[in-house]
């Protein structure tokens, strides 16, 4: 891999790996090698959830568990992680197999999000919990400053349903129109039909649930509720 690209990524992350093989593994999708990033992703997912939960607990001493859970879900969900990946220009660093390269896997939100979690796992193994906690909080600084408890933190499907129910309109319908990829790495495409919108709204995700949430979020934007 191009060392210039790797060094640029490490500068954006604010961390230089001592064990460069951990960085390369974190950037490797299972389509490219048997030594891929899924175990690191598993580890990073748990670390991210802990760090964000701990920070929310510290910042919001009077907020109940339900609101904190919703805020955490907003901060660690796939599209937030994919946004962060794009801020790091992570797409140009991914190691993908020929099929994923051809299908534009370097742009796919699920792959970008998973790679951020794998990087978190890799940095933890390369350093310690205090280092990765400091980095995560730095990456999330603006998002943590902006987030607040309340209805805004409900997931998109819930907010869309409550909006329609409040106006006595039919509930949205979700239809799977395409499933791509192998069983371990699928991408679902959903059409969501919503009263008040002329065309179905499209959402994609690595599971049906995530695709439905993505479609609901697009519907909320079209209804100008986002």
UniProtKB/Swiss-Prot annotation:
Nuclease as UniProt keyword: yes
Start and end residues of each RNase III domain: 6-128
Keywords: Cytoplasm, Endonuclease, Hydrolase, Magnesium, Metal-binding, mRNA processing, Nuclease, RNA-binding, rRNA processing, rRNA-binding, tRNA processing
Catalytic residues, chain numbering: 45, 117
Domain DRBM positions: 155-225
MF GO annotations: double-stranded RNA binding; metal ion binding; ribonuclease III activity; rRNA binding
Binding site for Mg(2+): 41, 114, 117
BP GO terms, sorted: mRNA processing; regulation of gene expression; rRNA processing; tRNA processing
Swiss-Prot/TrEMBL catalytic activity: Endonucleolytic cleavage to 5'-phosphomonoester
Localization per record: Cytoplasm
InterPro entries (UniProt xref): dsRBD_dom, RNase_III, RNase_III_dom, RNase_III_sf
Enzyme class: hydrolase
TM ranges: none
PROSITE patterns per UniProt: DS_RBD, RNASE_3_1, RNASE_3_2
Function: Digests double-stranded RNA. Involved in the processing of primary rRNA transcript to yield the immediate precursors to the large and small rRNAs (23S and 16S). Processes some mRNAs, and tRNAs when they are encoded in the rRNA operon. Processes pre-crRNA and tracrRNA of type II CRISPR loci if present in the organism.
Assembly and binders: Homodimer.
Family: Belongs to the ribonuclease III family.
Protein name: Ribonuclease 3
Organism of this sequence: Yersinia enterocolitica serotype O:8 / biotype 1B (strain NCTC 13174 / 8081)
Lineage: Bacteria, Pseudomonadati, Pseudomonadota, Gammaproteobacteria, Enterobacterales
Gene it is expressed from: rnc
């Amino acid at each position: 891999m191009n060392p210039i690209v790797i060094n640029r990524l490490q500068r954006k992350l604010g961390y230089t790996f001592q064990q460069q093989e951990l960085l390369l593994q974190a950037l490797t999708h299972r389509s490219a090698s048997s030594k891929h990033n899924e175990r690191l992703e598993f580890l990073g997912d748990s670390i991210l959830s802990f760090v964000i939960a701990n920070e929310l607990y510290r910042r919001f001493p009077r907020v109940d568990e339900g609101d904190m859970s919703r805020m955490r879900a907003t901060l660690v969900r796939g599209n937030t992680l994919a946004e962060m990946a794009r801020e790091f220009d992570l797409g140009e660093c991914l190691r993908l197999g020929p099929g994923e390269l051809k299908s534009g896997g370097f742009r796919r939100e699920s792959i970008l999000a998973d790679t951020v979690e794998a990087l978190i796992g890799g940095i933890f193994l390369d350093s310690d919990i205090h280092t990765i906690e400091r980095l995560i909080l730095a990456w999330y600084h603006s998002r943590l400053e902006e987030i607040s408890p309340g209805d805004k933190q409900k997931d998109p499907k819930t907010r869309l349903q409550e909006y329609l129910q409040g106006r006595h309109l039919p509930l949205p319908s979700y239809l799977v129109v395409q499933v791509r990829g192998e069983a371990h790495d699928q991408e679902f495409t959903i059409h969501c039909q919503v009263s008040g919108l002329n065309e179905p709204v499209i959402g994609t995700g690595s599971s049906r649930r995530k695709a439905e949430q993505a479609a609901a979020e697009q519907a909320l934007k079209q209804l100008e509720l986002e």
